Amino acid sequence: MFFSLAAVEVGTHLYWEIGGLEVHGQVLLITWLVLAIILTLAILGTLKLEQVPKGVQNFLESVFEYVSGIAKDQIGEYHYRPWVPFVGTLFLFIFVANWLGALIPWKLIHLPEGELAAPTNDINTTVALSLLTSISYFYAGFKEKGLGFFARYISPTPIFLPINILEDFTKPLSLSFRLFGNILADEIVVSVLCLLVPLLIPLPVMVLGIFASSVQALVFSTLSAAYIGESIE
């Protein structure tokens, strides 16, 4: 049993060399699959638009309304519309990626090195998503207020300058590590339980993982929208 537990690996990757750089091949494979699923849904939902939506169109319109509600609540009624595509893209990518990691037994597919898993299982993916949020935060603030945006760093007093600067650095860090840690921990727990008790015990944990995956997509997109709303206040 203890030798089986040693088969649960963390941090091993299938490396590809692209343009002289080493990239995590298994992350790219599942990322392309996530993008293909989202693109397929978008095409199927817009092929034949109907006045009374049904099927995939109805599902996509429900997702759009849900994401629009998140953006409107966090960014504000007068500024949220241009940011709906960004918030929606974050939500859909993380949601689909997390669900793929929670539902599909990737360990059944053997690679020369490493293991297939959700892209959000890799810290590079979550950091990249967080950096996009951080860039959007500064872009929104600078676009709305110009150079006056930077006055927030010395508000209410210049003494808070280092604290305010540090706060902007910790935002992407907290976003990335929260998502990465939750998804990685869930997949490790499921892997260990599958090795110990392969049949019944892992099922409740997998259901909990599916729920947690959905919550993480909501938390990440909501906080991203909240940061953008904060920058344009």
UniProtKB/Swiss-Prot annotation:
Location of this chain's protein in the cell: Plastid, Chloroplast thylakoid membrane
Origin, by domain of life? Answer: Eukaryota
Q: Which GO terms describe its molecular function?
A: proton-transporting ATP synthase activity, rotational mechanism
Q: Name one GO cellular component term.
A: proton-transporting ATP synthase complex
Record keyword Nuclease present: no
InterPro entries annotated for this entry? ATP_syn_F0_a_bact/chloroplast, ATP_synth_F0_asu, ATP_synth_F0_asu_AS, F0_ATP_A_sf
Which UniProt keywords are listed? ATP synthesis, CF(0), Chloroplast, Hydrogen ion transport, Ion transport, Membrane, Plastid, Thylakoid, Transmembrane, Transmembrane helix, Transport
Cited function: Key component of the proton channel; it plays a direct role in the translocation of protons across the membrane.
Q: Does the keyword Plastid apply?
A: yes
Which classification does the entry list for the species? Eukaryota, Haptista, Haptophyta, Prymnesiophyceae, Coccolithales
The record's section on NCBIfam families has: ATP_synt_6_or_A
Membrane topology per record: Multi-pass membrane protein
Entry-linked CDD domains: ATP-synt_Fo_a_6
Q: What is this protein's name? A: ATP synthase subunit a, chloroplastic
